[in-house]
């Protein structure tokens, strides 16, 4: 079973998982492939809306007081002002700095693609849009 991500792009992770398991019964491999496929297409559908984007990759544990926070925020703001969407994992630290810069830029777009991990990050408050994943690609 496949999920139509053209019509179901806003499904939650739980809804995707339940639909894939229900549609595949006891076939664990096909259920898992269905979930991975749906998550993958969901991510591409989101990024397709932003053909010009730059990813900032870095630690969620960087403190706002760090000497690196402001330069990352400033760079992301400049990138956003050039018309690029800023993409991060949606967490705090360096990701939050980049998202903040884009979010506060004039006409900036700040995106978070968050991996759902137990006892890990929460999304930062500087996102225009975000999606969650179970699987890390």
Regions found by a protein language model. Give the residues of each.
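Conserved phosphate- and dinucleotide-binding cores of soluble alpha/beta proteins
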Residues: 118-137
């Amino acid at each position: 079973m496949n999920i139509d991500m053209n019509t179901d792009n806003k499904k939650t992770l739980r809804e995707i998982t339940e639909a894939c398991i229900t549609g595949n019964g006891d076939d664990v491999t096909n259920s898992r492939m269905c979930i991975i496929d749906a998550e993958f297409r969901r991510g591409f559908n989101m990024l397709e809306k932003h053909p010009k984007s730059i990813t900032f990759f870095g630690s969620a544990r960087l403190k706002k007081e760090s000497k690196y926070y402001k330069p990352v925020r400033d760079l992301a703001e400049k990138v956003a002002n050039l018309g690029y969407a800023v993409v991060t994992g949606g967490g705090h630290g360096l990701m939050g700095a980049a998202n903040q810069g884009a979010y506060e830029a004039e006409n900036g777009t700040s995106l978070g693609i968050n991996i759902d991990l137990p006892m890990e990050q929460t999304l930062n408050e500087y996102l225009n849009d975000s999606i969650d994943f179970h699987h890390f690609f």
